[in-house]
């Protein structure tokens, strides 16, 4: 598995890096959580901007991003607007999504930006190039809350993300049986062993898939999302449990 380093955090090497989400409606609540997470064991904080009531207000977005950067110090900041189509809290047009991503990049506050693979469509390479020009790494994501596609399809999707220039392809899928979890893990191994251009982030959701959030070092997922009190997706494991298990399963 390959690796990338951001703010001295090496993603894709050793223990999977842990991300905790901020899912709050107001700027005050968002910054309060950021201050609390700044001293947590997490490596990265994801701001789920789709929860923020004023996310599409340029001034409010800029102010909140500056506050987050100040509160988090050297801890990584991943900014995500999860669309309703992929399980998020708010809907937005393609132009609004493009403007949001551009504003996040221009702010100079984000280390990582989540760009949805299907929402960006043909514009994905352009959006990724814009992020890179601003020094922002891109998590290119795809979520399926209904099923787990076959392994070949999962691998092909992550390869297309790599080809578009993504720094961290991310897949989250829902299992309907135990073999679905194995399909996701097998796709992860294939990417980590044979397609080394980037690290990848993968997870099988829900209670059945929770094990996939804990075995990334063995199977090749570079980051995992933990629940710090409020989950942002089904199957997220509490942060203290994630830390304990990841330490117990370390390969070196």
Stretch-by-stretch model annotation:
Residues 2-3, 14-133, 143-147:
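Active-site beta->alpha loop and helix N-cap motifs at the rims of alpha/beta catalytic domains
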Residues 7-13:
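Short boundary motifs at domain starts and secondary-structure transition points
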């Amino acid at each position: 598995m390959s690796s990338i380093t951001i703010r001295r955090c090496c993603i894709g090497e050793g223990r999977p890096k842990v991300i905790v989400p901020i899912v709050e409606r107001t700027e005050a609540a968002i910054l309060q959580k950021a201050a609390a997470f700044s001293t947590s064991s997490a490596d990265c904080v994801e701001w789920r901007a789709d929860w923020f009531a004023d996310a599409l207000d340029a001034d409010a977005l800029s102010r909140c991003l500056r506050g987050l950067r100040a509160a988090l110090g050297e801890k990584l900041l991943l900014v995500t607007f999860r669309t309703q189509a992929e399980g998020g809290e708010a809907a937005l047009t393609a132009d609004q999504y493009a403007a949001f991503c551009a504003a996040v990049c221009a702010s100079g506050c984000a280390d990582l930006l989540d760009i949805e693979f299907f929402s960006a469509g043909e514009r994905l390479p352009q959006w990724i190039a814009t992020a890179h020009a601003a020094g922002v790494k891109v998590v290119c994501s795809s979520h399926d809350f209904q099923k787990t596609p076959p392994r070949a399809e999962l691998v092909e999707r992550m390869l297309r993300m790599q080809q578009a220039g993504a720094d961290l392809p991310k897949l989250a899928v829902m299992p309907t049986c135990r073999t679905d979890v194995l399909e996701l893990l097998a796709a992860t191994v294939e990417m980590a062993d044979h397609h080394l251009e980037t690290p990848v982030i993968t997870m099988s959701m829900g209670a059945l898939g929770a094990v996939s959030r804990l075995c990334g070092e063995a199977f090749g997922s570079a980051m995992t999302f933990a629940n710090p009190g409020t989950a942002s997706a089904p199957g997220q494991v509490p942060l203290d449990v994630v830390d304990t298990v990841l330490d117990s399963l370390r390969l070196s």
